[in-house]
């Protein structure tokens, strides 16, 4: 519930319309095939209809993110708490489970931190991004656990001049990590610590394991223009023709802010006094190269607001995809982020939680 209350900056980005999703692989780097099946049984539309039946109305942003019209995550929390109360669900807060033991015959024993033990017919683990070490100590030892690492974060960069552009937003960029084959595109935000925004968050998700192995230090290539180098050359040629008498720093690409354009000109070695008419081929090529392949350095990561997503968890080959039941231990089920499923930002992680939970409920 605590995690639900902070998602979407406290507004609860409950799901996504999926209207702009070309491939589920783009939004679910891990768990793509499972999500294809689950979304057929319980889609974003099914989720919204379920909550609307409880009196909650929703609004969808241009980017597909869905929020309650109240813009208040607590409305969702209160709704779920009410439904649990009406159904007789007993909620034990501050109660920690240390171990789950399979007793056979569909029975499991929970060992609590205070020493108590209780037996249950069915156990559903929905603990979120729990560490792999804790999962290994809590679950039966024959269940495969994929190591957990952070998968949704922003980047610390080493370029101080870039950080001076704090607050700059570029609507369409392409990011890549040279030598890895990993890339992303989207809106990029320059912050006082480095880079954020959808493009950076997507890249952090796609490259979660790669960056963890590199201890969050890696080269970063930024395509500020968001297009090919040939296309940029054509744009620059037109700019030079139309603005031949103007200073290069004062007549740049309209989609880039004046501050960013001046920064990129300076990085390309173009003087503040240079006019377009005087810009030679070498300087033009350097400018185009900087626009399309600006080299920066990732030197660390920063958690995205109060949201913390991990990749890893219970390996997907350990569960039955129809109802999320553990293949080796009948009566033990897993939902949400405790599984090795994670997504980019935009409501997709919550949808995975809703869809896996529905699969369990339908199977019980």
Question: Can you say where each PLM-predicted feature lies in the sequence?
Answer:
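Extended, Lys/Arg-enriched charged tracts that mediate electrostatic binding to polyanionic substrates
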Residues: 160-181
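Glycine-rich loop(s) and the adjacent beta-strand/alpha-helix scaffold that form part
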Residues: 122-164
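A conserved short coil-to-beta-strand element within the FAD-binding core of flavoproteins
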Residues: 93-108
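Short loop/edge segments at beta-strand edges and connector loops
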Residues: 91-95, 147-149, 336
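A conserved FAD-binding loop/helix module that cradles the flavin
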Residues: 122, 126-133, 137, 340-364
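Residue-level recognition of phosphate/Mg2+-coordinating polar/acidic sites
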Residues: 20-23, 40, 46-64, 113, ...
